[in-house]
């Protein structure tokens, strides 16, 4: 894919000049505020495509102001508190459902997003956006356990209980967000990962408190340095990010606890109601849906692409990765997080903070 970057840009520049927002014949200057997960877009490292630079080249009168967050909850809190301008966000499925219900997302004008045609039908009509009004899938993936084969006995890698194993005390990392952390406890205890039962949530909290003595630290993006540099040996995290880490440390392996269950997610591009530049935001979303851009972006990130047209352009080794694209039988053992009632979300968050900070 790297050798085709100049061709990609030439094609996209030609196409963009046919659109009203390309800037090819316009003098209006626009700043587009994009708020995304950390390490979640190809930035031109190691000869990869710099997606933001490519967009700004295709749309010379749009300047992207790019900032990042570590969790859905941080993003939600920042937007719900108000007082900021954000034009594009990329929340996860359950958070999209919450934001739709609370009136925090704009309906999209799909006439400005013709590349939506390349999104596979299996990623449309979802539970969180059943009428396809508010979101365009960006990536999908699964959660599993990353472990270092130099230090972890494979006989111990049998399920989520590995994250509680005292043999590896001080070398275990844990998610620093309530939904993912509670999800693991729910899988381990055999509960529905979308439970609203307070007794079950309390049991999960107790299980996480039981784990705390063996946890080195609660992390999100900090996991990269910790696992790559062998400061930690075991951590739950996203399959796409594992594929980035293993390039830096080939002793890392990935395990999905299929017998107990694991989270399968979709992250999608949305426009919040605080947006000031909706057409530019839709142009950005459309740009990222281009098979050429999407394939180059996801090939670098390691995340799974929700577009067969894009996948067909990727390096066959990447597109054939079982970690990124598990088989149908494996996928049947994964479950998705649904939007929880506000009182449940707040209760879960308070329980998690008690564990984390207690």
What are these regions (language model features)?
Residues 329-358:
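Conserved C-terminal helix/tail region of periplasmic/extracytoplasmic solute-binding proteins
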Residues 173-177, 181, 185, 193-256:
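Ligand-binding pocket segment of bilobal, Venus flytrap-like solute-binding proteins
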Residues 1-32, 358:
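Short, low-complexity disordered leader/linker segments with a strong preference
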Residues 28-98, 225:
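Early extracytoplasmic/lumenal segment of secretory-pathway proteins
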Residues 106-117, 135, 251-263, 272-275:
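Short beta-strand->loop
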Residues 267, 272-332:
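Mature extracytoplasmic/periplasmic domains
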Residues 100-107, 129-133, 245-257, 319-322:
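Ligand-binding "clamshell"
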Residues 84-88, 106-145, 171-173:
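A structural signal for short loop-to-beta-strand junctions that line the ligand-binding cleft
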């Amino acid at each position: 894919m790297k050798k085709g970057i100049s061709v990609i840009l030439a094609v996209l520049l030609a196409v963009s000049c046919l659109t009203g927002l390309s800037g090819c014949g316009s003098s209006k200057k626009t700043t587009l505020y994009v708020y995304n997960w950390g390490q979640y877009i190809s930035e031109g490292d190691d000869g990869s495509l710099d997606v933001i630079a490519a967009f700004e080249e295709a749309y010379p009168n749009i300047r992207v102001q790019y900032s990042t967050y570590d969790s859905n909850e941080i993003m939600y809190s920042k937007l719900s508190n108000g007082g900021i301008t954000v034009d594009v966000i990329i929340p996860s499925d359950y958070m999209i459902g919450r934001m739709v219900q609370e009136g925090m997302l704009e309906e999209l004008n799909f006439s400005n997003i013709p590349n939506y045609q390349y999104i596979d039908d299996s990623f449309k009509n979802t539970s969180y956006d059943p009428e396809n009004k508010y979101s365009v899938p960006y990536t999908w993936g699964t959660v599993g356990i990353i472990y270092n084969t130099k230090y972890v006995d494979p006989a111990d890698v049998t399920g989520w209980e590995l994250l509680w194993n005292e043999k590896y005390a001080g070398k275990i990392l844990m998610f620093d967000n309530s939904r993912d952390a509670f999800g693991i406890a729910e899988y381990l205890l055999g509960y529905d990962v979308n439970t609203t039962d307070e007794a079950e949530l309390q049991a999960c909290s107790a299980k996480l408190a039981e784990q705390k003595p063996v946890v080195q630290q609660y992390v999100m993006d900090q996991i990269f340095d910790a696992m790559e540099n062998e400061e930690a040996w075991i951590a739950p995290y996203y399959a796409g990010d594992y594929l980035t880490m293993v390039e830096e440390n080939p002793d890392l392996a990935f395990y999905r606890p299929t017998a107990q269950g694991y989270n399968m997610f979709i992250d999608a591009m949305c426009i919040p109601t605080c947006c000031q530049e909706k057409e530019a935001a839709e142009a950005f979303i459309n740009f990222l849906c281009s098979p050429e851009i999407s394939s180059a972006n996801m090939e670098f990130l390691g995340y799974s692409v929700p577009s067969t047209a894009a996948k067909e352009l990727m390096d066959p080794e990447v597109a054939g990765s079982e970690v990124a694209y598990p088989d149908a039988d494996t996928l049947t053992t994964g479950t998705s997080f649904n939007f929880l009632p506000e009182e449940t979300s707040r209760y879960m968050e308070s329980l998690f903070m008690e564990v984390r900070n207690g």
